[in-house]
Amino acid sequence: RNARRSIFKDDKDRWILLDTLEEVNDRYHWFCHTYCLMNNHYHLVIETPDGNLSKGMRQLNGIYTMRFNRRHGSVGHVFQGRYTAILVQKESHLLEACRYVVLNPLRAKAVEVPERWRWSSYRATAGIERARPCLTIDWILGQFGSKRRTAEKRYRAFVMEGMRGHRIWDDVKGQSILGDEDFVSRLIDYARGYEEVKEIPKVQRYLNRPNLTEIFKNSRGEKRKRNGGIAVAVKRWGYSEREV
């Protein structure tokens, strides 16, 4: 988001962002279920099987900034501050989150119906145009039936019903979690435990850790096993990459 100026000077910039998103999806194994490009910000609904949102967002915004500046002969930041991320429970809230995102242009009074906004994923998911490579629509349509045309029709009706509903972001807990009570509670407990682990001094935390010889004793000569050993040494036992 950039509160003071547009992050897109023209439609070419918008295509560049979507092309960059496609590259990031491929590199970080993301699934983009929904997107909406506004003038001074954009929204994405991203599924990250590898839990690498931060790395991917740095790549997405960084590469787009580089391409934007090169194209327009400018320097400096395109985006102001850090992005806002909300963790969404897939089973109960992801569909609503996707609907909320594609209705942004209507809430901003930029258009009266979602299909008039070219720069969201609504048109592709609704069957009006072909989906760009950066977009995954199968999961959303699968929630509305197995027959494509029927699913698209039900999706369009579902989106329009959202204009009469409440704001889903009013249900966000702790400014970062959207889900049912059990989901929120489990995540808060997990985060609390993670913070407690970080408080334990490193020497105490890794008091009984195996040495590197033990970790790698069964991986000699096998690249795949050695790579697995490196991951265990660094992530599980706190060795630095230099030590490994």
Report residues per predicted region:
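Amphipathic alpha-helical hairpins
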Residues: H43-L44
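Short Pro-Cys-Gly-centered "Cys-loop" motif that presents a nucleophilic cysteine in a tight turn
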Residues: R1-M38, E47-E243
